[in-house]
Amino acid sequence: MAKITGNLVATGLKFGIVTARFNDFINDKLLSGAIDTLVRHGAYENDIDTAWVPGAFEIPLVAKKMATSGKYDAVICLGTVISGSTTHYDYVCNEAAKGIGAVALETGVPVIFGVLTTENIEQAIERAGTKAGNKGSECALGAIEIVNVLKAI
């Protein structure tokens, strides 16, 4: 029985990153964490392109454009949706998650879900590099690994 695994070497890989402007004070940290991790694992900065979109709801469209361009080995999607007093949060979270997942399945390109969905701003800040690590960095690791798993198959 073969065991297929992916390494964490990003040398020679190209990445697209889609980041939401809404809650940019958190998303900037997610983006920095992702880029830092990609570079530390061998990616060159000129092999990383970033696109900014208004909010999490708009991420899937740009992720699909990147994924179908043929330029990227993986696309990382970053954003933050913080619960409020209305159901808007539920709609945005659900549609962003469905859309991002659909892009990966439709294109065969790894598309990583890095949209924080938190109950409050404190949880978001914790996940952007304070107490709970940096989810942008974790998404970058996931992107590197899944690209290499797919190459090994």
UniProtKB/Swiss-Prot annotation:
Q: Which gene encodes it?
A: ribH
Q: Any idea which residues are catalytic in this one? A: 88 (proton donor)
Q: Which residues are recorded as binding (2S)-2-hydroxy-3-oxobutyl phosphate?
A: 85-86, 127
The molecular function GO annotations come to: 6,7-dimethyl-8-ribityllumazine synthase activity
Sorted alphabetically, the keyword list is: Riboflavin biosynthesis, Transferase
Q: Does the keyword Isomerase apply?
A: no
One of the protein's GO biological processes? riboflavin biosynthetic process
Cellular compartments per GO CC: cytosol; riboflavin synthase complex
- Class in the EC hierarchy, top level: transferase
The entry's function note states:
Catalyzes the formation of 6,7-dimethyl-8-ribityllumazine by condensation of 5-amino-6-(D-ribitylamino)uracil with 3,4-dihydroxy-2-butanone 4-phosphate. This is the penultimate step in the biosynthesis of riboflavin.
Q: Which organism is it from?
A: Actinobacillus pleuropneumoniae serotype 5b (strain L20)
Q: What is this protein called?
A: 6,7-dimethyl-8-ribityllumazine synthase
Q: Mind telling me which HAMAP family this protein's record contains?
A: Lumazine_synth
State how it assembles: Forms an icosahedral capsid composed of 60 subunits, arranged as a dodecamer of pentamers.
Q: Which InterPro entries match?
A: LS, LS/RS, LS/RS_sf
| Family designation | Belongs to the DMRL synthase family.
Source organism superkingdom: Bacteria
- Tell me yes or no: is Transmembrane among this UniProt entry's keywords: no
Q: What Enzyme Commission number does this protein have?
A: 2.5.1.78
The record's SUPFAM superfamilies line, in alphabetical order, gives: Lumazine synthase
The biological pathway it contributes to is:
Cofactor biosynthesis; riboflavin biosynthesis; riboflavin from 2-hydroxy-3-oxobutyl phosphate and 5-amino-6-(D-ribitylamino)uracil: step 1/2
